Amino acid sequence: MIKKVQHALILNELTKLRDKNTTTSQFRMALNQITSLLFFEATKQLPLATVEVETPFAKTKGYKLKNDIVLVPIMRAGLGMIDAIVRYSDKIRVGHLGIYRQTQTTSVISYYKKMPENISDSHVIILDPMLATGTTLLTAIKSIKEDKPIKISVIAIVAAPEGINKVEKMHPHVDIFLAAIDEKLNDNRYIIPGLGDAGDRLFGTK
């Protein structure tokens, strides 16, 4: 399922991400704000267990998450999305995937994988600001499926139709939460209008 999340604050912060004059610190802050809002949407239907809790005055019914959440940022730009989420639950763990797309081809290189122990009872959320050709995300999903999590979702900021269509065709049960669906990919496979290289803008590199 593709879910473009409609929210005034997302549009406000997305404009900052797109602006070429936005500073590195401003870019980080805007990325955090959008990631938080997308995370709320991605998790609002998570299964809950009923528990009894005692307030200072009485016992009452409460709820807790049934399953852990495992965040898997795709290095390096996905690393900038972690802090926006980890503060929301003590049931959040973090794995890492190192994958990059070769600029002149559609092939991808996987160079690092480190996952929490036993994620078979967890909901995995892949974090990557950009969904361009879809090849990086397909590689990530394939790798994570080897660990047999309950569910895989994706939080991305901006996506191109080409990448969305490719991933949805291969993995229709993976939910993808987005702030924007842009026009197209250019000849160099960058998203247009996009927001530039998210990793460079996030970390102040070129």
Curated annotation (Swiss-Prot):
Which keywords has UniProt assigned to this entry?
A: Allosteric enzyme, Glycosyltransferase, GTP-binding, Magnesium, Nucleotide-binding, Transferase
For this chain, the family text in UniProt reads: Belongs to the UPRTase family.
GO MF annotation terms: GTP binding; magnesium ion binding; uracil phosphoribosyltransferase activity
Q: E.C. number, please?
A: 2.4.2.9
Task: Kindly give the InterPro entries that the UniProt entry links to this protein.
Answer: PRibTrfase_dom (IPR000836), PRTase-like (IPR029057), Upp_B (IPR034332), UPRTase/APRTase (IPR050054), Ura_phspho_trans (IPR005765)
Q: What is this protein called?
A: Uracil phosphoribosyltransferase
Query: Pathway it acts in?
Result: Pyrimidine metabolism; UMP biosynthesis via salvage pathway; UMP from uracil: step 1/1
GO terms under cellular component: cytoplasm
Protein's organism: Mycoplasma genitalium (strain ATCC 33530 / DSM 19775 / NCTC 10195 / G37)
Entry-linked Gene3D superfamilies: 3.40.50.2020
* Binding, 5-phospho-alpha-D-ribose 1-diphosphate: 76, 101, 128-136, 197
Query: What functional role does this protein have?
Result: Catalyzes the conversion of uracil and 5-phospho-alpha-D-ribose 1-diphosphate (PRPP) to UMP and diphosphate.
Instruction: Enumerate the HAMAP family for this protein.
Output: Upp_B
Which EC main class describes this enzyme? transferase
The cofactors it requires, by name, are: Mg(2+)
| Enzymatic reactions | UMP + diphosphate = 5-phospho-alpha-D-ribose 1-diphosphate + uracil
